[in-house]
Amino acid sequence: MGATAESAAEQSAGTAPAGRLGFRPGQAVQEFGYDDDVDEALRASVEALTGNELADEDAQDVVDAAIYWWREDDGDLVDALVDALTNLADGGVIWLLTPKSGRPGHVEPSEIEDAAPTAGLHATSTISACQDWTGTRLATPRGGRR
């Protein structure tokens, strides 16, 4: 059991960040806002847990979830969220990842709270996603967005 337990523990440690965000094996996840400041360990964790590479923002396939790296100067958040909804399956979620308070590009929570309903979403929770990024889970209201 020793080797199996170690392997499971190592695997769990590698996928723990993605697990905190609620990702599951087999899910397709689209990524938006990639730049050199993203958390590579979180990206790798999502890919390891889901068993799929992250689809880039130009992908056209339907996805179960999206992660969006968003910084203060990235533009109009409402437009960005609407774009992220394009390929999102019914019942899918968007994790909006923003720099933590005190870090360059920090986004005030009130900006997210204002933008989400305009885009047809609501924030359901906010967590520390990784060392430098806060994650806000955005979902469509029950009954869908259409």
Residue spans for each PLM region:
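S-adenosyl-L-methionine-dependent methyltransferase catalytic core, i.e., the SAM/SAH-binding region
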Residues: 1-146
